[in-house]
Curated annotation (Swiss-Prot):
Coiled-coil positions: none
Source species of the chain: Cytophaga hutchinsonii (strain ATCC 33406 / DSM 1761 / CIP 103989 / NBRC 15051 / NCIMB 9469 / D465)
Name of the gene encoding the protein in the UniProt record: hslV
GO molecular function: metal ion binding; threonine-type endopeptidase activity
EC number from the UniProt entry: 3.4.25.2
Protein name per Swiss-Prot or TrEMBL: ATP-dependent protease subunit HslV
UniProt-annotated location(s): Cytoplasm
Length: 180
C-alpha cells in the first residue's frame, strides 16, 4: 500500500519574529486525497510551534513524543528536541518512523530528523518536504531582497512559490508565528 505523504513546511526568523507554515495537500501515490491537512501545530499554549512532513501517522506519533518531552523538560525546546532525536534513533519502534519535524519558539528554529540530527540553521531558514528546496530558495531571496516583509509574509510567499512549482504542494496554507 502506498503512503499518504508529500508536503512543504518552511520556517523563517526575520526582524525578531519566527514564523512557520505548511501547505495543506495530502497525496496517496500520485493522487491528491485531501486539500486541507493541518501540518503546523501549536504546543505549550502557542509558545512552541511544530511543522511536520512525511507519513501522517508517523508524524503524529513523533509530535506526541515531542510534546511529552517538552512537558518533561519544562518547555525547554532544545533539550526536548535532543531527547526526542536520541529516542528516535535508538528506539526499535521509533527508528522505523518516516517523518521530519521543524520546531520553533520565539528564539530558536530546529530541524529534527530520524537519523538523530537536531539542526539549527545558520541563515534563519528551515524547510522540509517535497517542495522544501523551492521554499528555501524563495525564503533566502526574500530575506536578502525583500527585507520590508514580515516573517509570516515571507513564509506565505515562499510557500506560494513552492506551490507554483511542486505538484505535491498546494496553496492552502497554515501559518503561525511564535509568541513569547
Amino acid at each position: 500500500m502506498e503512503k499518504i505523504h508529500a508536503t512543504t513546511v518552511v520556517a523563517i526568523r526575520h526582524n525578531g519574529q519566527i514564523s512557520i507554515g505548511a501547505d495543506g495537500q495530502a497525496t496517496l501515490g500520485n493522487t491528491v486525497v485531501k486539500d486541507y491537512v493541518k501540518k503546523v501545530r501549536k504546543l505549550m499554549e502557542g509558545k512552541v510551534l511544530c511543522g511536520f512532513a512525511g507519513s501522517t501517522a508517523d508524524a503524529f506519533t513523533l509530535l506526541e513524543r515531542f510534546e511529552e518531552k517538552l512537558n518533561t523538560y519544562a518547555g525547554n525546546m532544545k533539550r526536548a528536541a535532543i531527547e526526542l532525536a536520541k529516542d528516535w534513533r535508538t528506539d526499535r519502534y521509533l527508528r522505523k518512523l518516516e517523518a521530519m519535524m521543524i520546531v520553533v519558539n520565539k528564539d530558536e528554529l530546529l530541524l529534527i530528523s530520524g537519523t538523530g540530527d537536531v539542526i539549527e540553521p545558520d541563515n534563519d531558514i528551515l524547510s522540509i518536504g517535497s517542495g522544501s528546496m523551492y521554499a528555501q530558495s524563495a525564503a533566502a531571496a526574500l530575506k536578502k531582497h525583500a527585507t520590508h516583509l514580515s516573517a509570516p509574509e515571507m513564509v506565505r510567499e515562499s510557500l506560494s512559490i513552492a506551490a507554483d512549482i511542486c505538484i505535491y504542494t498546494n496553496h492552502n496554507f497554515v501559518i503561525e508565528t511564535a509568541v513569547a
